């Protein structure tokens, strides 16, 4: 009985940015030393729906000889709102042996999606008057305009003749969140 399995895969580019396209190459091997696999139908599915095929989700190969290999190429796209994380993608291979017996194999691959970081800030709010020797405080609004959670956000500032190398840890910022650092 022929047995198909994914032995390698490659994504170009190396990872998908949300909203971007890529080409996925999936290398399949028939591990049988006795029979070829024929009428092979490939399909791709990512459970969250954040990775989609550009055209059809399927592909076809007439046969893979015993011990042979085949590379299935499928153009894919990550939707604009895709989460920045590794995504598990199912590859299903439906095929027949030489006698027409229907067989199915399913493998999982991992594709990385990244979201562009968008961190912006308002102008600093200064005290109206600063007297030498006093501690002058200022504040600044920092906004996460991206779709990814930002961790360990650190606001570092250098104010000539007042403060040098001071920092404020804003911590974790969820998408769409603003924090005031002072």
Descriptions of predicted regions:
Residues 10-16, 61, 124-130, 170-171:
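Short beta-strand segments of immunoglobulin-like
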């Amino acid at each position: 009985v022929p047995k198909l399995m994914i032995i390698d895969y490659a994504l170009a580019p190396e990872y998908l940015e949300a909203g971007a396209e890529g080409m996925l190459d999936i290398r399949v091997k028939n591990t049988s030393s006795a029979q070829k696999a024929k009428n092979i139908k490939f399909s791709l599915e990512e459970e969250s729906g954040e990775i989609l095929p550009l055209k059809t989700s399927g592909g076809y190969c007439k046969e893979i000889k015993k011990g042979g290999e085949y590379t299935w190429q499928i153009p894919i796209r990550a939707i604009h709102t895709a989460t920045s994380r590794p995504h598990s993608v199912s590859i299903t291979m439906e095929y027949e042996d030489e006698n027409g017996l229907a067989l199915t194999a399913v493998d999982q691959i991992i594709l990385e999606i990244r979201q562009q970081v968008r961190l912006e800030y308002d102008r600093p709010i200064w005290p109206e008057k600063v007297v030498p020797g006093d501690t002058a405080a200022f504040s600044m609004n920092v906004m996460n305009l991206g779709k990814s959670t930002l961790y360990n956000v650190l606001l570092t500032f250098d104010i000539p003749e007042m403060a040098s190398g001071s920092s404020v840890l804003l911590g974790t910022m969820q998408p769409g969140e603003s924090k005031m650092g002072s």
